[in-house]
Amino acid sequence: GGIRSTIAKGNLTVGDVFTLYPFDNVLSVITMKGSELKKFFDTVAAYGGMPVNAGVRLVISNKKVKSLTINGKAINDSQTYTIATLNYLVNTEDYFKNHLTRMDYSIYVWDYYTAYFRHLAKNNNGQITASKDGRITVE
C-alpha cells in the first residue's frame, strides 16, 4: 500500500494527509475475473496483509490465504468483480495485468482522503476515530 505514516491524535491538517499519502496517484476502477482477483489476495497474504475493502474477510496462515470472502461469499473464479485501486498498481503489478476493463479518475488519491476525513469529522462532531473490524486475520 501507499500509506506512509500514521495519524497522531489531535488536529488533522492537509499537510498530514500529504505525509500519510505523498504520491500523485489517481483512482483506477477495473473489472477482473475472480481467478485473477485471487492472485491479488495471494500477494496480500504473502505480505502479511495490506489495506482492503470493508466487505473483505481474509484469514492468512503462514503467509498463505486460508479463507477469503467478499460480502460473506467465496470468490467465484468465473465471476467478474469490480474493484477500485491505485493507477500505479494497475500499471505495474502482475496481478492486475489481466483486468477486463479500466476507468481512471482524474482526482488524486490524497484529495479523496482529504474529502473523506472532512466528511467523517463533519458527521461526528469534529471527531475521526478508527477501530479494528476484522478484515484481515493473521494466524
List each model region and its residues:
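Catalytic centers of hydrolytic enzymes
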Residues: 1-139
